[in-house]
């Protein structure tokens, strides 16, 4: 029997059911074996237009909300449990758009399976014509009671809007250090969460995600709790492969002021992240352990890149850009 690759975790498995391994069927689809989508991207676009006025999911990337009807995932305006993102239609602003869905899938798996960061469950799924799309399970609903969690992104928590901080508010209004202060203020287990947040920031740096702005980090309170927690990681992508970024290596500044090292090199290095760790009270021993982990885990990252559905060109770019960032951190 031929080995096949799971569209959820990229595991090689002879016993896939409709392209998914048993673990992903349980975790991503709550035990339901999903059929391939019953519509293609053309129909997706029509459905998106029909539902856009009523859907509650935000962001600029084309997406729709899905829910199960028996074993079929169908578009819905309300109470959807999944978000579907197709390959974008080329408009000249995005390069290599055919790799975007699989790029996001790979980036999320690196976060979840290698860095062990709490990360939204996700996978790839086939349209009716076989084209792959990215699918992620919503984490803002209780799976047993179906109650929606109280969730607020960091822009909302800090009261940052286009009116208060201008059109580019998601990027210009604050630093990652300011975000860490929000975690310290609102999250009860802030010591653990600060280390989690540090790992998220350095992962975004390594994978060249230049769009990790303040709306891509959120706090939520679960249905039976008054405590706030960092939500699982979401919206991860090597953006540099798709956009010629002109404004630096990260979506927002790491610190409130540039270090002498940054001013000398023009990019963030080991010293900048060491300073960041100090300012957020991450113990030196934990910082050292994370940096050692990054160095030791590169082979796992490379294996996952090779197993992914990225094009050969995208795989090479992802590896080289990741290694370049490691060199900046004095790790390779």
Predicted segments, located by residue:
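ATP-dependent phospho-/nucleotidyl transfer catalytic cores
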Residues: 128, 133-206, 263, 271-275, ...
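Charged, low-complexity, helix/coiled-coil-prone segments
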Residues: 37-58, 118-119, 137-147, 208-222, ...
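C-terminal catalytic region of ATP-dependent kinase domains
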Residues: 1-8, 96-99, 112-114, 123-129, ...
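Conserved kinase catalytic-core segment
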Residues: 99-115, 172-245
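Short, charge-rich amphipathic segments
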Residues: 28-48, 81-85, 109-111, 200-213, ...
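Conserved ATP-binding subdomain of kinase catalytic cores across diverse folds
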Residues: 43-166
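TRNA-binding/sensing appendages of the translation machinery
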Residues: 1-40
């Amino acid at each position: 029997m031929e080995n096949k690759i799971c569209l959820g975790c990229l595991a090689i498995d002879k016993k896939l059911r409709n392209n998914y391994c048993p673990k992903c069927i349980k975790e991503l689809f709550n035990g339901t074996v999903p059929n391939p989508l019953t519509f293609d991207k053309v129909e997706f676009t029509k459905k998106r237009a029909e539902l856009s006025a009523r859907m509650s999911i935000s962001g600029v990337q084309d997406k729709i909300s899905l829910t199960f009807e028996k074993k079929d995932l169908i578009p819905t305006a309300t109470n959807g449990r999944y978000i579907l993102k197709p390959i974008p239609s080329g408009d000249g602003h995005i390069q290599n758009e055919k790799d975007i869905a699989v790029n996001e899938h790979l980036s999320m798996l690196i976060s979840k399976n290698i860095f062990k960061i709490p990360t939204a469950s996700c996978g790839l799924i086939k349209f009716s014509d076989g084209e792959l799309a990215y699918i992620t399970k919503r984490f803002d609903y209780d799976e047993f009671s179906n109650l929606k969690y109280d969730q607020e992104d960091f822009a909302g928590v800090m009261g940052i809007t286009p009116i208060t901080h201008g059109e580019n508010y998601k990027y210009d209004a604050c630093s990652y250090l300011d975000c860490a202060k929000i975690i310290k203020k609102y999250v009860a287990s802030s010591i653990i969460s600060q280390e989690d947040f540090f790992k998220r920031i350095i992962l975004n740096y390594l994978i060249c995600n230049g769009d990790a702005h303040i709306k891509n980090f959120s706090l939520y309170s679960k249905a039976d709790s008054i405590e706030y927690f960092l939500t699982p990681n979401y919206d991860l992508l090597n953006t540099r492969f798709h956009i010629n970024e002109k404004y630096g290596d990260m979506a927002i500044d790491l610190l409130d002021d540039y270090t002498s090292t940054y001013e000398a090199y023009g990019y963030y290095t080991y010293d900048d992240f060491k300073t960041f760790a100090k300012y957020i009270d991450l113990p030196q021993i934990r910082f050292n352990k994370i940096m050692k982990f990054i160095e030791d885990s590169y082979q796992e990252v490379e294996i996952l890149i090779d197993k992914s559905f990225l094009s050969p060109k995208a795989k090479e770019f992802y590896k080289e850009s990741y290694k370049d960032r490691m060199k900046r951190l004095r790790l390779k």
